Design a protein with these regions (language model features):
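Catalytic toxin/effector domains delivered as secreted proteins or via bacterial secretion systems
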Residues: 249-250, 257, 269, 273
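Active-site rim/loop-helix segments in enzyme catalytic domains that contact anionic ligands
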Residues: 58-242, 313-323, 330
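Short, flexible/disordered intra-domain loops and linkers
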Residues: 133-140, 257-266
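N-terminal secretory signal peptides
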Residues: 1-25, 36-41
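Active-site environment of divalent metal-dependent phosphoester hydrolases
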Residues: 102-104, 129-130, 255-259, 297
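The feature marks non-catalytic terminal segments
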Residues: 170, 222-225, 243, 262, ...
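N-terminal twin-arginine translocation
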Residues: 22-65
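Proline-aspartate-enriched helix->loop->beta-strand connector
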Residues: 236, 240-254
């Protein structure tokens, strides 16, 4: 969930990614039970810190028309991908625009997957860099790994590998050294900004321009091979199939009425997954789409112990994100936008998308 409009005129120094992260206060068992009762207990004090920006209202994405996505048909039989993963149990492949979309919009369902012993393969399409470069993107990646550690109850190191896919894309994959049923794969494409117009530091281009054909290709911020629209679709389809999913979770697609006001990157990724999932052999009913920013307009449905645990996970991530961070549960819940989203989580099936 990248929520920065434009880089500030004088960026402050980024936090050292090697700095010790917040120690988790684990309430995982409470989340895994799937019970949400009562109010948030014993909110601790703490000051909300905006290192780069200050907001008084939740962010809202610009509505930009998006061209239809036409996936390239896969060869049959499908060649084995270098990204192919070991078969798992009740496997979910989760495809998100930014590192933290899952812990904000799809929790406590996300924690339930991890706590149940099922297999989870997560893919982040953009770097969520907000025009601030690879170092900042890597801090966000470290934050999401820390959040997963909080949910799984381990602090063992993660192994890192670079993979070149059949599509020609190069991705980075992280796998816990003690838990191979989990993985995080990142493409590191440039953040598209709330405006959908990208950032000056990355050529003012993002997923919206790529899909609409106003730029011919996007260059990952880690200097990986450039991807045009068809190669991006091939890459996402390849990664989905490589994860051997029983289920897919992702952002709400652009063509849904629930996408109005969402981050343009969220809409692009949701539409991309919706287009390529059938090519990857996934039935429409196996895909769940999570409402992003507009979830704030829905009734609160995450409360009590489930909210406590969700906020713990988010605060663990936020301790690594030097742009917007919160110190304690009260501060996280007071943060414009984040406080509303953390109290809500709405997944929609294909039949519930309200397609426009």
């Amino acid at each position: 969930m990248s929520d920065i409009d434009e880089p500030s005129g004088a960026d402050q120094a980024l936090v050292d990614p090697a700095a010790p992260r917040r120690s988790g206060i684990s309430r995982r068992a409470l989340v895994f039970g799937g019970i949400a009762v009562g109010g948030l207990a014993a909110l601790g004090g703490g000051a909300l810190v905006y290192r780069e920006i200050r907001r008084s209202a939740p962010p809202e994405g610009t509505w930009v028309k998006l061209s239809p996505i036409v996936p390239v048909p896969e060869a049959s039989p499908r060649p084995v991908s270098p990204a192919s993963e070991e078969p798992g149990s009740d496997t979910t492949v989760a495809v998100w625009a930014h590192a933290d979309d899952d812990i904000i919009f799809a929790n406590p369902h996300l924690a339930g997957i991890i706590g149940s012993g099922a297999t989870l393969r997560t893919i982040f399409v953009t770097a969520g860099d907000a025009g601030r470069g690879l170092d900042y993107a890597k801090q966000r990646e470290a934050g999401i790994r820390a959040a997963y550690d909080e949910m799984r109850g381990s602090t063992q190191p993660w192994n890192t590998a670079q993979l070149t896919l059949r599509s020609g894309a190069r991705v980075t994959r992280f796998v816990p050294s003690d838990d191979p049923r989990l993985s995080i794969t990142v493409l590191r494409l440039p953040d598209g900004n709330l405006s959908g117009k990208g950032f000056a530091t990355t050529g003012e281009a993002g997923l919206t321009q790529l899909i609409n054909g106003t730029v011919p290709a996007l260059a990952p911020i880690d200097d990986g091979p450039t991807l045009d629209a068809s190669r991006l679709a091939e890459t996402v389809a390849e990664l989905i199939h490589a994860g051997r999913p029983d289920h897919i979770t992702t952002n709400i697609p652009h063509e849904s009425a629930f996408a109005r006001g969402d981050h343009p990157d969220h809409s692009c990724v949701g539409s991309l997954v919706r287009a390529v999932a059938p090519v990857s052999g996934i039935a429409p009913e196996a895909v769940t789409y999570y409402i992003g920013y507009p979830s704030q307009h829905e009734p609160v449905n995450v409360e009590g112990d489930a909210l406590d645990a969700k906020v713990d996970v988010y605060a663990t991530y936020a301790a690594q994100d030097p742009v917007v961070t919160c110190d304690g549960a009260a501060a996280c819940l007071a943060q414009p936008g984040f406080g509303q989203w953390l109290r809500r989580s709405y997944g929609k099936t294909e039949a519930e998308l309200r397609l426009t």
